Every structure is written in structure tokens, then in C-alpha cells.
Regions:
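C-terminal alpha-helical interaction appendages
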Residues: 1-70
Length: 70
């Protein structure tokens, strides 16, 4: 899977999340439920898009790197 495929896979699922969630919250929860690596990105890599939407790109990049290294 390429980075673009991964990102599109995550971004397409945002519409299924509750409407009152911010984008970062949605992305975090999608990555956590589908791939199980969101908390590693948040706590080990120190990139937290759940509380800071400005970190979405960095979060997705770090999550993708973790998937590629599995």
C-alpha cells in the first residue's frame, strides 16, 4: 500500500464518524480501530492529532511509517 492509498483509505472513512468530531479526532480513531497504531504514534512518536488538527499530516506520515515497518 502506498502512502496515498493509506491516506485516502483513512480520509474516506471520516464521513462515517460522528459529525461533532473534529478531523483530527476522526483520523485518530479510524487509525486506532483499523490499524491499532494510533496510540503508538501519539505516545511514542509524540504526534497527537486527536487534540491538535495541525498535526494531522505528521500523524498520517508517522502512522504510515509504522505500518511499513510491521
Amino acid at each position: 500500500m502506498t502512502y496515498n492509498e493509506f491516506a485516502m483509505d483513512v480520509l474516506e472513512l471520516i464521513e462515517e464518524c460522528p459529525k461533532d468530531w473534529r478531523s483530527g479526532q476522526s483520523i485518530f480513531n479510524i487509525v486506532d480501530s483499523k490499524y491499532g497504531i494510533a496510540r503508538d504514534v501519539q505516545f511514542i512518536d509524540g504526534i497527537d492529532c486527536f487534540y491538535d488538527d495541525n498535526q494531522i499530516d505528521a500523524f498520517l506520515n508517522s502512522a504510515y511509517k509504522r505500518l511499513k515497518n510491521e
